A protein has these predicted regions:
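Bacterial Sec-dependent N-terminal signal peptides
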Residues: 1-41
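Extended soluble regions of mature proteins
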Residues: 33-309
């Protein structure tokens, strides 16, 4: 990512966010018209990974799905409290020679933004909150992964070789969606993973970055269940376009991306001010400044990949 120069900052119109806080900050949104664009800023306590700008993003079609798999994605936001977790509905779009794993919720929000006005966003802000921002393209380009994600309002892209996952098959079995599944375990990116796969689906793939088993991965979770993916639906007659955003990506590496993400997740307000040129003023219900909210914080969870440091 290229740093923003003082000259560019001076030219940039400063955008000031006044965030009214309820007694318990769970999620906050403000919509405003900026140069005839709709902008929505979402700051989520716990996981600050989403500041969504409600400006429609153009998409480039790179394929057409022939099968789609829906997954429930669950992850802890506080490893000391197993009741604090978040969920998302993810979709794995599969076509000949490649696949895309992305948030179905984010796809829905993007579609909704395109037909909504700023007034509608203000009236029903919860409709525009949620959804993971990352997408993973397997074998795109050939022999590699492409990973895209957002930090604040900035788009990032990195490529990596398709990783080798050394699975050990086990005698464990289970039934998911009527499919008899077999077990396997492996160590990958700093975690011990357990997977259940079936050879009754004509696809050798899986959620997130998983693959390499003699069948389709229906469920996978790490030791401690901090991260878990479970297949909850299969569409064998899909025809939805597989797309990638046409945006100015900051091309980076996996390690550098996680370092940038950590900067934002631990101190989002400073990141927004220094990188995005956005001044953030947080006030409570009484109208008084809440500087405690803008202080840096320590994450109560680990990223899904632990080996990046």
């Amino acid at each position: 990512m290229h740093p923003i120069s003082h000259q560019n900052l001076n030219k940039m119109k400063k955008r000031v966010l006044f965030i009214a806080l309820a007694s318990a900050l769970v999620g906050t949104m403000m919509a405003q018209e900026v140069e005839h664009r709709k902008e929505v800023y979402v700051i989520k306590a716990g996981k600050a990974s989403g500041i969504n700008t409600a400006t429609p993003v153009e998409q480039k079609e790179i394929g057409k799905a022939v099968m789609e798999f829906m997954y429930d994605y669950k992850y802890l936001t506080d490893t000391t409290d197993v009741t604090r977790n978040e969920t998302d509905r993810m979709t794995l779009q599969v076509t000949y020679g490649m696949s895309k794993f992305t948030s179905f919720r984010t796809m829905q929000i993007d579609s909704l933004i395109r037909v909504s006005t700023a007034e509608q966003i203000r009236a029903t802000p919860d409709s525009y909150i949620g959804g993971e921002t990352f997408s993973i393209f397997k074998n795109y380009p050939q022999g590699r992964f492409t990973v895209i994600d957002k930090v604040s309002t900035d788009w990032f892209l990195y490529e990596e070789d398709i990783p080798v996952q050394e699975w050990t098959l086990t005698d464990d079995t289970c039934n998911i969606l009527g499919y008899e599944c077999k077990g396997a375990v492996c160590n990958f990116r700093g975690r011990r993973w357990t997977a259940f796969y079936t050879d009754s689906v004509p696809v050798a793939d899986g959620p997130w970055k998983f693959g390499g088993l003699p069948g389709f991965i229906m469920q996978v979770y790490d030791e401690g269940h901090q991260y878990e993916f479970t297949c909850v639906g299969i569409n064998s007659k899909a025809d939805r376009a597989i797309t990638i955003p046409e945006v100015p990506f900051n091309k980076t590496t996996r390690t550098k991306f996680y370092a940038t993400k950590l900067r934002f997740d631990t101190d989002p307000f400073t990141y927004m001010m220094n990188v995005n040129g956005v001044n953030v003023n947080v006030v409570g219900a009484d109208g008084q400044p809440r500087t405690d909210i803008t202080q840096p914080r320590t994450l109560q969870y680990d990223y899904i990949e632990r080996d990046w440091k």
